[in-house]
């Protein structure tokens, strides 16, 4: 612990009494903006993302963001299940376990979003989002690609939801952008969402050189492009969030969970 009088004085002058917003808040700072065209002052909430440390989280991992898949196409003995669940390399544990499942001739088929609240939030945004996210997670395993813009391209080629692509409509890109924007400004996985944006101003991004860039929600296209081209999937702790292990259900079917977490470069 150390004192920084000049910083404390500045924080007090801008009425900042906490270094970090609560995890349940999307807004880190509220700013009154003056629109020169309309002459109207509006108070806007902004989320602050810093590139000075590690990559910022856009959608936090939790048990609520687990997606459940059924293992189909092969039988597994209890010993084989235990053997696969014990695979624990220093890196790529999830990939190695999935590869072991595939070597038995089995495949992962999307079953459900584990958390009903998160499922409802996704369906409110777009009824196809649970299926799209499940395909993003599978395609990440298949290709090793984690950048969401590139994964969206892969889904557009594969078209797993069989959209009509005769007119080049960017279904996957648009829906993923909508998800990212909602997660950035208001929606949280484990909290029933009203559809309202909390951080209705946009993002303040602190660059590595200390400059601050504002991605204002008024310029929605630019804001959505920033999220889309900087977002990537990251694998969280398998033990903390209880995923990436084969589970034998009461009915004898086998399940395998994958976790959905998004960060920004």
Residues covered by each model-derived region:
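Short, positively charged
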Residues: 1-26, 32-265
């Amino acid at each position: 612990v150390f004192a920084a009088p000049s910083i404390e004085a500045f924080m007090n002058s801008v009425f900042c009494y906490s270094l970090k917003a609560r995890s349940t808040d999307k807004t880190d700072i509220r700013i009154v903006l003056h629109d020169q065209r309309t002459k109207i002052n509006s108070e806007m909430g902004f989320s602050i993302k810093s590139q000075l440390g590690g990559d910022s989280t856009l959608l936090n991992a939790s048990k609520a963001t687990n997606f459940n898949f059924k293992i189909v196409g092969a039988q597994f003995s209890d010993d084989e299940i235990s053997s696969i669940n014990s695979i624990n390399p220093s890196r790529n544990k999830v990939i190695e376990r999935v590869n072991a499942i595939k070597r038995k001739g089995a495949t992962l088929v999307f079953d459900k979003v584990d958390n009903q609240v998160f499922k409802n939030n996704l369906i409110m945004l777009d009824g196809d989002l649970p299926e799209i996210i499940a395909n993003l997670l599978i395609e990440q395993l298949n290709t090793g690609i984690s950048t969401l813009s590139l994964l969206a391209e892969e889904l557009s080629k594969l078209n797993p939801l069989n959209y009509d692509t005769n007119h080049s409509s960017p279904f996957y890109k648009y829906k993923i952008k909508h998800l990212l924007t909602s997660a950035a400004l208001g929606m949280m996985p484990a909290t029933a969402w009203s559809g309202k944006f909390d951080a209705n101003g946009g993002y303040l991004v602190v660059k590595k050189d200390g400059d601050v860039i504002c991605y204002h929600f008024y310029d929605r296209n630019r804001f959505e492009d920033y999220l889309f081209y900087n977002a990537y999937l990251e694998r969280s702790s398998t033990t903390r969030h209880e995923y990436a292990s084969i589970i034998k259900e009461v009915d004898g079917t086998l399940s395998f969970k994958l976790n959905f977490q998004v960060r920004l470069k």
